[in-house]
Amino acid sequence: MLFLVRHGETEWNLHKRLQGQQDIPLSEVGVNQARELGLHFQNQHIVFEHVYTSDLLRAHQTAQLITKGMSISKFTIEPNLRERFYGELEGEYIDDIVKLMPDYDKNFGVKMQYGIESLEDMQKRMVSILTSIAKVTEGSPTLIVSHGGSINALLHYITKGEMGTGKGKLANTSFTRLQWSNQTFHVQAYNETSRLKVT
């Protein structure tokens, strides 16, 4: 069972600045969100046997806070779980970017400018790394902390466009639960936030 978690809130999330692969830490709210999610998993008696996280600070911090108090012997830091690279636009305000490129984050097949990683390339690396993780972990409870754009690109692939990119945003510290069987991913929970008290 794969629990795919978007990192906790950062100040750039709050101020609607495009983070991409900039190494931004969690805000105080983000820290509390991650702790709360960890307590939720413990209350549900979910014990992770494997933990994978993007190498970006906000994801790594989230993974550490979620698993505090759990007996986790090893974290696997995986750069392919990173957020999409937004090139020259990283750090800009999202409202300004939408005026410049309305489809920058919604549609596949759009020619990218400003050095932005294409949605197709991001999706390929996410599908590849998640498939590898699924094969290695063989159904055991696995925590994977990544980023909203990356997770959505994966979900777009899995659901043939019914979920994911262009269909909505993932909340900070929401989790999406995937089952891997017969060489295929199956979505069992999506953008789950019902236990969130910290916003």
Residue ranges: model-predicted function:
Residues 162-186:
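Domain-level recognition of soluble alpha/beta enzyme cores
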Residues 44-47, 133-141:
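Glycine-rich phosphate-binding loop signature in dinucleotide/nucleotide-binding domains
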Residues 10, 150-151:
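Short active-site segment of divalent metal-dependent hydrolases/proteases
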Residues 67-127, 188-190:
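Phosphate-handling substructures
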Residues 47-70, 74-79, 179-199:
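Conserved histidine-centered catalytic loops in small-molecule metabolism enzymes
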